Amino acid sequence: MPSCEECNRKYGQIESDLRFRSWLGVDPTAPQSLGIAQSVQRSLDPSKAKREKDQRARKRQFDKLRDMVIPLSMIQADNILPDFGPVPGTAKEDLIPIGIPAEGWKAFGTKLARGSAFVLEDRYIEVDQKVDVLPPMYEEDERATKIRRAIREHGTYHRVGPGFVVGHGLAFVEKTETGLLTPLTLFRFEIWGRVRIYAQIVN
């Protein structure tokens, strides 16, 4: 979708950062994410660099990764990204927690929702319309279940390239002060079969 140079650069950096952080937790054998983990490993390995400049960049990327690590003692079950918890049987000392910035999550979800509205509905999200990116949820959570049901019954799913599925639907909520029904555009984004982002827009 059309965007100004500043926004394109800003959201591009956010997307790149989140993609890098999320890559580290995907299943390297899953069809939706095949090759992703291997690509990240290569991007961190200076020995794979062809030039000195590239070698320095890979070292900076490794240093950046090290700064993302959160002490294991600070991690609680309720702040682990859904479906990114430890693999059963993994020794505790082998776990490396990586932080996902909440603001980055929201900004990336907003970018996906705005872009999807433009592509699927041929419309812009105006400045007075709120894009509500929901906190990470497990698929069995009540709110996630309701959104999936609404998309299944009143929407469609679109496969946008390998490992990326967009669910797009409509629901109505009642405004208590007026009793009128307000339409909501619903989105469910699934990336690599692992990252799931839910968003809604009040129309």
Tell me the role of every PLM-derived stretch.
Residues 40-86:
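Short flanking/linker segments adjacent to small metal-binding domains or redox-active Cys/His motifs
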